[in-house]
Amino acid sequence: MRRKQTKKPAVPSARDVLLGITGKDFTIIAASKAAMRGATVLKASDDKTRPLSKHILMALTGEAGDTIQFAEYVQANVQLYGMRNDIELNPSATASFIRTELAKALRSRRPYTVNLLLGGYDTINDKPTLHWIDYLASSAPVPYAAHGYAQYYCLSTLDKHHHPDISFEQGMKILRMCTDELKRRLPIDFKGMIVKVVTKDGIREEEYKDDEPVACP
C-alpha cells in the first residue's frame, strides 16, 4: 500500500525582522513594517504583532497565509479561555499552548510555517517575559531574541549590551543599535519598525523614527 505524502514544513523566509528585548519592568517587541514577497514590497505599513490579552503580545513572521491564520487561531483561543475561566492565561502558559499547537500541526499534513516572539508581563510574579518560538515547535524563555535577518546581525549586539536590569531608555538605545546595524549591513529597506512595549499597565505602541541614514564602514 502506497503511503500518503504529507506536506513538509518549509523554512520561513528571513526577509522580515523581529526583535525582542526584556528589561527591569518591560518587554520591547519590534517588527519590520514591510510585507515582502521575494524582492517585492507588497505593503509598507504591515503590523506583524497581535495582542493576545492585556499583558501578552505576539509577533509573527513566515508565510503570509500561515501567519494570519495561526495568529487568529491563537488569539481566539486565548480569549475564549479567558471568557470561560474568568482568568487570563499567563505568558508561560500561553507559550506552552502555542508550542503545543505548532507541534500538532507539524505532525499533520498542514504544518504552519511560522516563527514568532511572545512578549508579556507576568503580573503574578511581577516580571517581564519573552519566549522565542520557531516553526519546528521549539520554545525557550529568553532575555532577548530575534527572528529573520535580525538573528544574523543583531544577536552579537544584544549579547554584548543587554543585562537583566536595563532601563527602558537603555532598551530603546540597544534597539536603535540593532536597527542601525541592519541598515548598515543589508541593502534592504524594511520601511521602518513598529515598536510596542508590554508593562504591568498593559501594551502600548512606542513612537520610533527609523528614517535617519546610517553611514556604512
What are these regions (language model features)?
Residues 1-217:
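Long, low-complexity N-terminal extensions
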